[in-house]
Regions:
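Residues that cap or delimit alpha-helices
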Residues: 26, 49, 134-135
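Amphipathic, non-membrane alpha-helical segments in soluble helical-bundle scaffolds
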Residues: 27-38, 61, 65-68, 112-116, ...
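Acidic/histidine-rich alpha-helical segments that form the ligand environment
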Residues: 32-44, 101-139
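Short, charged, low-complexity loops and linkers
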Residues: 16-32
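A short, mixed-charge helix-start or loop-turn motif at secondary-structure junctions
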Residues: 23-27, 105-109, 147-151
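A glycine-rich, hydrophobic loop/mini-helix early in the fold
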Residues: 34-62
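Short, contiguous alpha-helical
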Residues: 1-12, 17-20, 54-98, 124-127, ...
């Protein structure tokens, strides 16, 4: 029997909005994909200077530092949802406004090193949670932002969200 964490979630396990994130994740064990995403981030973003971190590729767009803190914020929210649902909590979980969070993140006052440390720490916590889940938790369904979603889908969304943003960073901030 294949582990639930190695099975890509079916489209009925998550809102269609997240399909692009799920599709970013390579086939196989999603915990390994989470680890791989952290390695990609470290390789891509190591040794970037502060000027690069404070750069936005267009007026009204987030700076690189804001993008990275958005990734940390989103991951915390996805993983919090996964924890609640994995533990059988059926409380509907609210949505959140990423565009309201970014300007309040304090990204401009932080160093790239501190932001990278935070992103790495958040990812380590995510890996630890998902690695330790019992097999039956992966298929539990809860409600987030008014829509049904499974723990498995949240793991794949978590992995794919960072990969998506690393692609944007490569193309628009570093390219």
């Amino acid at each position: 029997m294949t582990s639930h964490r190695a099975q890509r979630p079916s489209p009925d396990e998550y809102p269609s909005f997240y399909a692009g994130y799920v599709s970013q994740v390579p086939d196989g064990d999603v915990v390994e994909a989470l680890i791989g995403g952290a390695e990609i981030a470290a390789a891509l973003l190591h040794d970037l200077d502060e000027e690069r971190g404070d750069h936005a590729y267009a007026p009204g767009k987030w700076t690189l530092k804001e993008v990275l803190l958005h990734c940390a914020d989103a991951e915390r929210i996805f993983v919090y949802r996964a924890l609640r649902i994995a533990r059988g909590d059926q409380t509907p979980l609210p949505g959140w406004d990423e565009n309201a969070y970014a300007p309040l993140s304090g990204a401009g006052a932080r160093s790239m090193d501190s932001i990278m440390d935070e992103l790495e720490s958040v990812r380590e916590g995510s890996v630890t949670l998902f690695h330790g889940l019992p097999e039956d938790a992966w298929t539990r369904t809860g409600n987030a932002n008014g829509k049904p979603i499974t723990v498995r889908a949240l793991a794949w969304i978590t992995a794919g969200h960072l990969l998506h943003h690393l692609g944007v960073v490569q193309e628009r901030y570093l390219g």
